[in-house]
Amino acid sequence: MRNVLYPKLAATNIKKNGKTYFPYLLTCILTVMMFYDLLLVSTNSALDTMPGASQLRLILNFAVTITGGFSAIFLFYTNSFLVRQRKKEMGLYQVLGMDKTNLTKMMVWESIYTAGAGILGGILAGIVFGRLIFLVLLKLIRFDVAFQFSVEPEAILISAGLFGAIFLVILIWNIFQVQRVNPVELLQGGKKGEKEPKANWLIAVIGILLLGSGYYIAQTTESPLSAITKFFIAVILVIFGTYALFTAGSVALLKLLKKNKAYYYKTKHFVSVSGLIYRMKQNAVGLANICIMSNIVLVLISATASLYIGQENIMNTRFKTEFSATSDETTPENIQAMERIVQEETQSRGLEIIHEQKYRYVPLSAMKYDNQLKFDTDSGSGYDADAMRGLYVIPLADYNALEGTDISLAPDEVLTYFPDEEFDSGEIVLGKETYHVKENLKESNLQKKKEADVTKNIYLVMADDAAVEHVIQLYGPTKIPITMQYLLNFDMKGNDTAKSEALESMKARMETSGEVQSCYVEYREAYAQEFYGVYSGFFFLGIFVGFLFLMATVLIIYYKQISEGYDDKDRYQIMQKVGMSKKEVKGSIHSQILTVFFVPLLMAILHVTVAFKPITKLLLVFNLSDTHLSMMCTIGVSAVFAVFYVIVFAITSREYYKIVK
């Protein structure tokens, strides 16, 4: 009889607490399903047949890790709401005669039901939707592949093992919570409030300083290279600043509202403000969590959507021309062989070469400070990402041939071209030597003005080959010897099929036939499918992980409203008994929700607005230079999220009102 009691009691408890348990169970099922399907897709052998398979698999494996890690944190966090709501119930069981051993047995069965439903339901849902999810990925990549769908025992075992361990840790924690308190504390657990916190202005000021510092770093980041590190520093500062402002700043704000008699002594404001002050320490952390998670959803989805939608822009940024060949063998014979192959392959197919660039150059890097270019090989020259420039040194003869000019230079004279910034000095210091600037070029076929690139570029035209070699000596020794290279870029006009054939043939002849020495060829068409795979994988990752964080945000809002409702139930009933009408009670509820629950949304949108500049710099690392597209994606995602947030608010506030009335 006793063996049947605990399973029945556990099932009854779950059913009775359906308002809090069923959303949790649904979340468990969806979380397990997402993890299982990501694992299934990432280990599917069909991925190996796709272009960019290694990068795509790396992205998917990263998504699996993120999903697994966040699932543990998320389920543990949401479980705390369930425990808090059930403390009074647990205390009542002890008063009625159940000891802590009996409670433990009941909780074990509740965990078995919860874990069983979550894991089994999630894996079954994953099996049902797994094929659909893989087909969505293929659709995003624009690639057809034979996909053999099968139930993978290994994926099932890994999913069941991971989430089984998560639920076991949650059970142990729940048992510890019940074992360490007495029945009286449990009976008060559901109602237990906190002492009215004082307005901690020090923490509030620290929060403002942290937030301001994060915002300042975000707005002063100029280089995409520095954005990689600075953005994450800014994110950490903003996260800590957000928590500090919500925990201390919110209390300070409510205290100011309380001092504002015109606002505070209105019926609908009086109850909500005083109640929120009383429990703000606990509320503030939950609201900060909602803000941070909302921010993650907005940034993740808008950034990956920008990459996916802007793939054409990415291709144009990465590949300035249809064909590009580079060789570090710059003998006249080798250069002539490259040009001969191009001529033969294009003329035989009736293609016309346009936008041609061909010249020798030395690729270097330097840090620019005013009119000084410091090499990173110089002793004492630390790495400065904001000052870093791509430096291309070109012999005058090649420049004259490219531009059709007849300029002459003395050994200590140079032509300078700064396509990405202004430069008007008459001298330029290169390493330890000073050169006179004969002309600062305003336009050049070397590169278009303000052309998007990860680093800003500088072009220096030197008097002759000897002057170029001298610059290499100034640069100093490197692990890989620096040599002059020959660049051959061009577009073609003609039939698309003929273009494809010519591109493929030129690549094969220059790289593998032996006609040309030490040559590397790349062309847009060859890498298009690989790029689609990588950036579609990012979008797939953004949707999946973004949905996971969105689900967490919704559940936290829901539980926050439910727990607030139970906390306020007695208080509002007392208010109705002393004369407040239902309309006044509802007005007070809306005052509380509008004052507090929309603050996380507004703060998240503010964070995204400030973060937009460094995000566009980071996207440039991925070759996306279309800022307008990024802005439209961010605005669109923010608008959709705001509408979704309002819908969640409407549903949860209705549940809140049902509880308190």
Regions found by a protein language model. Give the residues of each.
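Hydrophobic alpha-helical transmembrane segments
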Residues: 21-25, 61, 156-161, 201-205, ...
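Hydrophobic alpha-helical transmembrane segments of multi-pass inner-membrane transport and secretion
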Residues: 18-46, 55-88, 111-125, 239, ...
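Hydrophobic alpha-helical segments
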Residues: 113-257
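N-terminal Sec/SRP start-transfer signal
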Residues: 1-32, 196-201, 210, 246-294, ...
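Basic-flanked hydrophobic alpha-helices used for secretion and membrane insertion
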Residues: 314-327, 333-551
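Short cytosolic juxtamembrane segments of multi-pass membrane proteins
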Residues: 2-4, 8, 180-194, 566-567, ...
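Short helix-loop junctions at transmembrane helix boundaries
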Residues: 40-54, 123-156, 212-229, 600-661
